Regions:
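A non-catalytic, helix-rich entry segment at domain boundaries
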Residues: 1-62, 67-72
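Short acidic, glycine-rich loop/turn motifs
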Residues: 23-26, 88, 129, 243
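A sequence/structural signal of beta-propeller blade repeats
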Residues: 41-232
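Structured C-terminal portions of repeat-based eukaryotic scaffold domains
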Residues: 229-251
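Structural alpha-beta junctions
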Residues: 28, 130-133, 246-249
Length: 251
């Protein structure tokens, strides 16, 4: 979690600010000497982040940059422009759900960048390859149209949960490019009964997360209830985290 305090401007980046990182150890903001473009912290400044890299979208092209990585140089930041996006018929490439990468740097030869757009389109590319171009996948199952994508090192595939969290879909650049690998998820009856209590929530979102330490996959359920009498302010939030084994059992 970061914060940026305005501190001036530069010819290269315009308005800039000092990067501060929230420390979970002491509960305080730790200010760094790193200066970053203020454009990156605007509401529509970025479309996603992965492994410390942030992605921006401008004029139909995605750019990856390491400005918000406190370990990266602010005098010589890395900024990698990807090929212009190609919009599939009856799809859109202006509203992005999120961005994921298969490795820690887009400069790695085998790194694959995935951009999940709201709707049916999922686009993949290898930035380090000389003839880098987008591979566009049309998702046919509407249950994935609003899902967030993540990369599984264990399975070497990009995966996302279906709406409702009942199953997952996984894609790659090989045989699962057009036909995703689907896996049903099985929840304990007691947990299903408890989750039904949140069926009336104003917001329910599902995310897949993989542990970099153990390779285990987790399903994160995020329930939000808003108070209409207080201009829609959040009344309460509830997070539920479940570990998924290789057979799809949630524990």
């Amino acid at each position: 979690i970061f914060e940026v305090e305005p501190c001036g401007s530069t010819l290269r980046d315009g308005d800039v600010g000092e990067l501060a990182i929230f420390s979970y150890i002491d509960g305080e903001l730790d200010f760094t000497d790193k200066k970053v473009p203020m454009d990156l912290v605007k509401e529509m400044g970025t479309i996603g982040a992965s492994h410390g890299w942030v992605a921006t979208l401008k004029n139909g092209a995605v750019r990856l940059q390491d400005d918000l990585d406190p370990r990266a140089s602010d005098t010589d930041p890395k900024r990698i422009s990807l090929p212009p996006l190609v919009t599939l018929p009856h799809c859109q490439t202006q509203i992005v759900t999120n961005v994921a990468m298969s490795s820690s740097s887009p400069e790695d030869e085998e790194c694959i960048v995935a951009v999940k757009f709201m709707g049916p389109q999922l686009s993949l590319c290898r930035p380090a390859q000389r003839d880098c171009k987008w591979t566009n996948i049309r998702i046919t199952d509407p249950s994935f149209f609003f899902s967030h994508v993540m990369y599984s090192k264990r399975d070497e595939m990009f995966s996302m949960p279906a709406s409702g969290g009942n199953y997952t879909g996984s894609w790659d650049l090989g045989r699962h490019r057009h036909k995703p690998k689907l896996q049903m998820l099985w929840y304990p009856e007691q947990r299903m009964v408890k989750d039904r209590l949140f069926d009336s929530c104003s917001r329910m979102e599902y995310y897949l997360v993989e542990s970099s330490e153990t390779g285990e996959t987790f399903m994160v359920k995020w329930f939000t209830e808003r108070n209409p009498r207080r201009k829609g302010r959040v009344k309460w939030e509830y997070f539920h985290v479940l570990r998924l084994d290789k057979e799809g059992n949630a524990v």
